[in-house]
């Protein structure tokens, strides 16, 4: 067998083997992911049909109108029917792709329809880790998430250092978590199982390890798990601050109590820098620092007292937004949720005003 044929066979085998992998976005385990799967497959099939039609016509025209000795030069002239066809068909194609896409994107912003009330989980990214605070249950986990199946989960996304992207491929698409604000993202697991979650936004040398495990369980098993976690160590501020450091190893942890008892990351984006200071942690460029010197001077214990809850976000101060602190013995009730909603509406208004101002500055709003 020639070298070319061997390479061709090897290449063909690799293509076939790629179909054996478990592509997570096509292995949907929730309603949001299922609608995304349909949209992707619909778009692929639709565009393949267009490609086959265009390439088929291309082949026919090459064969039928190829040059030969008896060929006559064609005479170009106006044809209203043909011009209408090649003007209308692209519009139909764009509409057929755009309408379901836009509709699906707007549907993502609404919680999936369910008879059960949605539960709330604060998903906070920091130090190349994910922190999950359960305000109703007053428990917190690190790099692991447990949710009941068939119940919508409203994730309140926050970032304490760099911008990240929260993504559980088998449950739905990604959404950004940014400093100084809270973004809502609702997902639901329709089956029990263990899924992978990750930060899909490249944001530094620790990006690849910012992953977490998602356990979707029955409501009975979820209640049992919550009871077990409540019996574990209570999360104190020293422990939380140390976990914020990129130098602290990424491990799956579970705590009684939450960080919401002493910090609101959206209201206090400067909190993490104080945590760095407490443990003498300094950000260093990995390109110019040896591995042994990256975290050489980091203290194992805090050197200064813990920071009190406060507002350092200028937007919070300017617009009278409230500091959201929930003690471990305080209920996550309608009064707290009302203040949450008020902050969210104010932040949305700030974002819209900034966008309008940007449009005015660049002429995009006219």
From Swiss-Prot:
Entry keyword annotation includes Membrane: yes
EC numbers on record: 1.10.3.-
Biological-process GO terms, alphabetical: ATP synthesis coupled electron transport
The reaction(s) this protein catalyses: 2 a quinol + O2 = 2 a quinone + 2 H2O
Residues that span the membrane, as ranges: 38-58, 80-100
Pfam families: COX2_TM (PF02790)
Location in or out of the cell: Cell membrane
First-tier enzyme category under EC: oxidoreductase
GO cellular component: a single term: plasma membrane
Protein name: Probable quinol oxidase subunit 2
Organism: Staphylococcus aureus (strain NCTC 8325 / PS 47)
Gene: qoxA
């Amino acid at each position: 067998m020639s070298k070319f044929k061997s390479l061709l066979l090897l290449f063909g085998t690799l293509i076939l083997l790629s179909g054996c992998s478990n592509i997570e976005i096509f292995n949907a385990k929730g309603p949001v992911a299922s609608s995304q799967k349909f949209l992707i497959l619909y778009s692929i099939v639709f565009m393949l049909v267009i490609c086959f039609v265009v390439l088929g016509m291309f082949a026919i025209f090459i064969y039928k109108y190829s040059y030969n000795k008896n060929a006559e030069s064609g005479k170009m002239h106006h044809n209203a029917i043909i011009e209408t066809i090649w003007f209308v068909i692209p519009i139909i194609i764009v509409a057929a792709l755009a309408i379901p896409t836009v509709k699906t994107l707007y549907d993502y912003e609404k919680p999936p329809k369910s008879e059960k009330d949605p539960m709330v989980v604060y998903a906070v990214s920091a130090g190349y880790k994910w922190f999950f605070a359960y305000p109703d249950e007053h428990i917190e986990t690190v790099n692991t998430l447990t949710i009941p199946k068939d119940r919508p989960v409203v994730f309140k996304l926050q970032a304490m250092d760099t911008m990240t992207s929260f993504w559980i491929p088998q449950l739905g698409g990604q959404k950004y978590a940014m400093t100084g604000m809270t973004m809502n993202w609702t997902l639901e697991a329709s089956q029990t199982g263990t899924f992978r979650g990750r930060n899909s936004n490249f944001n530094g040398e620790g990006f690849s390890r910012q992953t977490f495990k998602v356990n979707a369980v029955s409501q009975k098993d979820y209640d049992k798990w919550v009871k077990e976690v409540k019996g574990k160590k209570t999360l104190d501020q020293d422990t939380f601050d140390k976990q914020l450091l990129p130098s602290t190893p990424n491990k799956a942890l579970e705590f009684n109590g939450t960080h919401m008892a002493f910090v609101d990351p959206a209201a206090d984006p400067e909190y993490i820098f104080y945590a760095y200071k407490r443990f003498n942690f300094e950000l260093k460029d990995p390109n110019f620092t040896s591995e042994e010197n990256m975290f050489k001077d980091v203290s194992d214990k805090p050197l200064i007292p813990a920071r009190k809850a406060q507002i350092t976000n200028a937007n919070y101060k300017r617009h009278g937004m409230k500091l959201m602190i929930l003690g471990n013995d305080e209920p996550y009730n309608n009064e707290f949720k009302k203040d949450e909603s008020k902050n969210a509406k104010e932040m949305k208004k700030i974002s819209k005003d900034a966008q309008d101002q940007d449009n005015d500055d660049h002429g995009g709003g006219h």
